[in-house]
């Protein structure tokens, strides 16, 4: 390997560069995107996200949870993918939450990016938008989501039909089937 490469090159600079490159360690994946300063901690628990949305969440429900890195696609958003085994296939749902402090100037673009991510990269059958009931523009958000086929599925006291648990009372769940 290393000797054969050196035999083909007679330059000491090339030899030195090849030797250095052969022993170079690739750094770990960064936790911050240099493009926009967004932090992402892939080891942070998606279970914790789901437990905040569904206080009765129990990891023993037989559902798998993973981190889809929503905040890298849409800063200010968080989320988790929940998977159920359905025979030979996995039925997957992407749950997302927008912080109340999120910049709304790109809201439409972010929602479309989330829908694209869910169908393309995450292979989810639906996206559940977990909206804060206290949002000043909740009515217009609901209208926009209904326009793309969204349905309110998790009002306070109402079980989410997919997980079968009630969300915290501060959230309204809106499901868009893909």
Where are these regions (language model features)?
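Noncatalytic linker/hinge segments flanking ATPase motor cores
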Residues: 134-137, 170-174
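Conserved active-site alpha-helix within GNAT-family acetyltransferase domains
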Residues: 136-152
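Non-catalytic substrate-recognition and accessory regions of acyl/acetyltransferase enzymes
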Residues: 1-109, 113-117, 121-131, 151, ...
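Intrinsically disordered, low-complexity, Lys/Arg-biased terminal tails
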Residues: 146, 155-157, 170-172
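Charge-rich, low-complexity amphipathic helices
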Residues: 140, 167-168
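Ankyrin repeat (ANK) tandem arrays and their immediately adjacent linkers/low-complexity segments
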Residues: 161-165
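Conserved beta-strand-loop-alpha-helix junction that forms the acyl-donor binding cleft
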Residues: 129-140, 158
């Amino acid at each position: 390997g290393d000797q054969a490469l050196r035999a083909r090159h007679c330059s000491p600079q090339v030899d030195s560069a090849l030797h250095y490159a052969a022993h170079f360690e690739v750094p770990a994946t960064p936790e911050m995107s240099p493009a926009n300063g967004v932090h992402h901690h892939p080891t942070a628990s998606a279970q914790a996200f789901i437990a905040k949305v569904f206080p009765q969440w129990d990891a023993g429900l037989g559902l798998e949870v993973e981190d889809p890195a929503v905040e890298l696609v849409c800063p200010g958003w968080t989320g988790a993918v929940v998977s159920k085994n359905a025979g030979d296939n996995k039925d997957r749902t992407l749950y997302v939450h927008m912080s109340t402090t999120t910049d709304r100037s790109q809201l439409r673009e972010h929602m479309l990016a989330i829908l694209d991510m869910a169908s393309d990269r995450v292979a989810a059958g639906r996206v559940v938008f977990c909206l804060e009931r206290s949002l000043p523009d909740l009515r217009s958000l609901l209208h926009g989501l209904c326009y793309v086929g969204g349905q309110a599925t998790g009002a306070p006291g109402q079980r989410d039909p997919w997980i079968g648990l009630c969300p915290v009372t501060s959230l309204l769940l809106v499901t868009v089937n893909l």
